[in-house]
Amino acid sequence: KRKDLDVFILALPHGAASEFAKPLYDAGKKVIDLSADFRLSSPENYKLFYGVEHPCPELLKKANYLIPELSENKTILNSKLIACPGCYPTSVITPLYPLLEEGMIQSENIVINAMSGVSGAGKKVSESFIYCERNESAVAYGIPFHRHLSEIEEQLSKAAGKALIVQFNPHLAPMKR
């Protein structure tokens, strides 16, 4: 409702962010989205990995997937809809993108073994996330279709200039704060 605001940062659940992003975008506002709603350019991949139809697929191609360290300032300044990457994708894309873009590593057979504490697995309540279950025990999860896989493959494919398939193995590890 406030017309004096130019930039909106959305920190909403996947699916909900789109409902707010569309009218803001249409009103000419800059939208920075922290959810996964605009991270993928394909509505088919969004449905495959998030289990629902994308609420406004017409905006997917208009969103700029942005890791500041890999983006030019003009891209950041000129973007009206910014999709912020997920945690695992940030940790994978940031080092691999420039290496693939410059042809410094082979693009075939990329294997990514990533680990996070249980807080990296989301907010759902699960017995497997409590300390006594995780302590001294690392476990892989979300294989072979972790929802960040499509995001990683899409961005690394752009860097390599061809379609890539990577092996992404996320793990929950016992990490104390």
Tell what function each PLM region has.
Residues G142-R177:
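Oxyanion-binding "anion nests"
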Residues K1-I143, G161:
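N-terminal Rossmann-like NAD(P) cofactor-binding subdomain of oxidoreductases
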